[in-house]
């Protein structure tokens, strides 16, 4: 387990969520899918969100049930272990719909 403070992990989640939103704010799905650099940057930011979530202890997570902790860790696992099978349509939906919600919920924490 990491010796970093929970606040540091929450900061990582917020910073990475902000990055995802910034990287994709002025583009549509076609530009996302055709721009390898943006795809890689978004995937890396989502991996960081999941990795940071993984290190937040269960007692803390239980205090904030509106944050999808397990789903964030699960997405990280999919992105890292099944890279060649990524569903980019689903990933785009996560970027546009779920990441802003995650950001909002983590800001409340």
UniProtKB/Swiss-Prot annotation:
Q: What family classification does the UniProt entry report for this protein?
A: Belongs to the HepT RNase toxin family.
One Gene Ontology term, aspect cellular component:
toxin-antitoxin complex
Subunit structure, briefly? Answer: Homodimer, probably forms a complex with cognate antitoxin MJ1379.
Q: Where is this motif: RX(4)HXY motif?
A: 76-83
Q: What is this protein called?
A: Putative RNase MJ1380
Q: Where are the active-site residues found?
A: 76, 81
InterPro entries xref list: HepT-like (IPR008201), HepT-like_sf (IPR037038), HepT_RNase_toxin (IPR051813)
Query: Record keywords: Hydrolase included?
Result: yes
Task: Provide the E.C. number(s) assigned to this enzyme.
Answer: 3.1.-.-
Q: Is Transmembrane helix included in the keywords of this UniProt record?
A: no
Source organism of the structure = Methanocaldococcus jannaschii (strain ATCC 43067 / DSM 2661 / JAL-1 / JCM 10045 / NBRC 100440) (Methanococcus jannaschii)
Q: What does this protein do?
A: Probable toxic component of a putative type VII toxin-antitoxin (TA) system, probably an RNase. Probably neutralized by cognate antitoxin MJ1379. Neutralization may be due to AMPylation by antitoxin MJ1379.
Positions carrying O-di-AMP-tyrosine: 83
Q: How is it modified after translation?
A: Modified by cognate antitoxin MJ1379; probably at least 2 successive AMPylation events occur on Tyr-83.
Q: Name one GO molecular function term.
A: RNA nuclease activity
Coiled-coil region list = none
């Amino acid at each position: 387990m990491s010796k970093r403070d929970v606040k540091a992990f929450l900061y990582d989640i917020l910073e990475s969520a902000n990055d995802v939103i910034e990287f994709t704010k002025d583009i549509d799905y076609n530009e996302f899918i055709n721009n390898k650099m943006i795809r890689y940057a978004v995937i890396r930011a989502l991996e960081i969100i999941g990795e940071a979530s993984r290190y937040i202890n269960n007692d803390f997570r239980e205090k904030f049930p509106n944050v999808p902790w397990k789903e964030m860790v699960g997405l990280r696992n999919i992105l890292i272990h099944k890279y060649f099978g990524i569903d980019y349509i689903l990933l785009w939906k996560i970027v546009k719909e779920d990441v802003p919600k995650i950001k909002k919920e983590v800001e409340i924490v």
